[in-house]
């Protein structure tokens, strides 16, 4: 071999000298190459041994890290394009009007009252004429779902149209909520839902009277209801599917109705009067005006007859700041006491009653809280009621699986959870329960007097 060729080869590959010591980086690169080679061979071998691995879908996709800006932007852009495409697939107002016109044109007499009806044959004809966007609604399954007792085998045009409208609204709302899903995982964090509601406020005529300075308190009040009931494990996020499935969003969007009755506003947690009521109560309790509630200030809540023992447990278990409660924690407290029949509220109160943290209430737990009721009765000049009688009544009402223990599920299943918890934490509630027969008789007498007049 010519010496020139040898020299050229040596200069072209300086690392080929076996005597030369490899650098640390070169060793790492070589190790990585070997690892990749052997791992690929092993992985390929696994695939060859079992063909079913090819059919298993990928179920984990790593989210971009904070420093991976390009990947984050790509993910955001792709999600935005996807949601825009989904939005274009929905029926717009003009297409909905056209659908209504086609349905009305193909109705089949006779009408039932003022309800226009349509049979399956014409139902399919409308589906062909309505266009590709409507295809999903014109199926045998949908027709059968809406078919009730019509002797001609028809369905109500209005019921079908309302079904389509509801579906379109659900998809629109899901897309709207998904725009605030920063992670793109089908969940909304507290800050995500806050942003959604904050941007929704200007579209709700019933909230026009709210001052902008109150917006942050309104948003906090609204968001807490979603998280109190839909996030029982306190993970800090709730599924978009759960938001759509519950009635809270319907209640919130009901505020678009400019002619909403006063009664409806009073019973709607999201209405301006309700939010102002809750916040006003908080301000009235805050006597030292420091923006927080102490145990003494909270003791004046409602009829001011809650026991000190129960209030102690509230401040032991709930999040506080230097022993005082902020507005967000207060909202959880209010939601629990105002909705005692709901499982989420019972879970909140049960945790406070379970002083031994055993997951159940026993005779000791019941006696611990009822003694405080007996003490308040003495202070108010009433004869204390025997604990044994109350204990027997509670166990008779709940009928727990274990005759000596009451679990949270026992309380929920009994449908008496609100009564039991009221008896144990509030003197006024206990007095109302104890005198229920006299109160019912008094109401009947008053009703009879009104009838006589």
UniProtKB/Swiss-Prot annotation:
GO terms for molecular function: metal ion binding. GO terms for cellular component: centrosome; cytoplasm; nucleus. It comes from the Eukaryota. PROSITE patterns: EF_HAND_1. Residues 1-27 are annotated as: Disordered. Pfam families: EF-hand_13. Residues 273-308, 341-376 form the EF-hand domain. Interacts with MCM3AP/GANP, PPP5C, and the phosphatase 2A core enzyme composed of the PPP2CA catalytic subunit and the constant regulatory subunit PPP2R1A. Finds in a complex with ABCB1, TFPI2 and PPP2R3C; leading to the dephosphorylation of ABCB1. This is Serine/threonine-protein phosphatase 2A regulatory subunit B'' subunit gamma. The gene is Ppp2r3c.
């Amino acid at each position: 071999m010519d010496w020139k060729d040898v020299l050229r080869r040596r200069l072209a590959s300086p690392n080929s000298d076996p005597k030369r010591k490899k650098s640390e980086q070169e060793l790492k690169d070589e190790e990585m190459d070997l690892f990749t080679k052997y791992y690929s061979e092993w992985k390929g071998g696994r695939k060859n041994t079992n063909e079913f691995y090819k059919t298993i879908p990928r179920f984990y996709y790593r989210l971009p890290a904070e420093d991976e800006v390009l990947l984050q932007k790509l993910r955001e852009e792709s999600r935005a394009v996807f949601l825009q495409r989904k939005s274009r697939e929905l029926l717009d107002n003009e297409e909905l009007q056209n659908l209504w016109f086609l349905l009305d044109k193909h109705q089949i007499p006779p009408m039932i009252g003022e309800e226009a009806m349509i049979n399956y044959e014409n139902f399919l004809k409308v589906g062909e004429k309505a266009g590709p966007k409507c295809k999903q609604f014109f199926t045998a399954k949908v027709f059968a779902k809406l078919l009730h007792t019509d002797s001609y085998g028809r369905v109500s045009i209005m019921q079908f149209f309302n079904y389509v409208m509801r579906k379109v609204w659900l998809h629109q709302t899901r897309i709207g909520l998904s725009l605030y899903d920063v992670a793109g995982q089908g969940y909304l964090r507290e800050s995500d839902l806050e942003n959604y509601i904050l941007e929704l406020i200007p579209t709700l005529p019933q909230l026009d009277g709210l001052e902008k300075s109150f917006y942050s308190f309104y948003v906090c009040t609204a968001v807490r209801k979603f998280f109190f009931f839909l996030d029982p494990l306190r993970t800090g996020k709730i599924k978009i599917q759960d938001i759509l499935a519950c009635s809270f969003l319907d209640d919130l969007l009901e505020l678009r109705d400019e002619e909403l009755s006063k009664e409806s506003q009073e019973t709607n947690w999201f209405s301006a009067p309700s939010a102002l009521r809750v916040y006003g109560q908080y301000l009235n309790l805050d006597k030292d005006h420091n923006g927080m509630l102490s145990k003494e200030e909270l003791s004046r809540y409602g009829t001011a007859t809650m026991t000190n023992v129960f209030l102690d447990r509230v401040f032991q278990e709930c999040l506080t700041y230097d022993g005082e409660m902020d507005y967000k924690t207060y909202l959880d407290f209010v939601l629990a006491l105002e909705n005692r029949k709901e499982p989420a509220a019972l879970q909140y109160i049960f945790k406070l009653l379970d002083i031994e943290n055993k997951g159940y209430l026993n005779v000791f737990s019941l006696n611990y809280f009822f003694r405080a009721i007996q003490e308040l009765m003495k202070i108010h000049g009433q004869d204390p009621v025997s604990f044994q009688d109350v204990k027997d009544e509670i166990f008779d009402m709940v009928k727990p699986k274990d005759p000596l223990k009451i679990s949270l599920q026992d309380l929920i299943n009994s449908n008496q959870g609100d009564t039991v918890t009221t008896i144990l934490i509030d003197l006024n509630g206990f007095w109302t329960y104890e005198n229920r027969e006299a109160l019912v008789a008094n109401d009947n007498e008053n009703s009879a007097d009104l009838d006589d007049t």
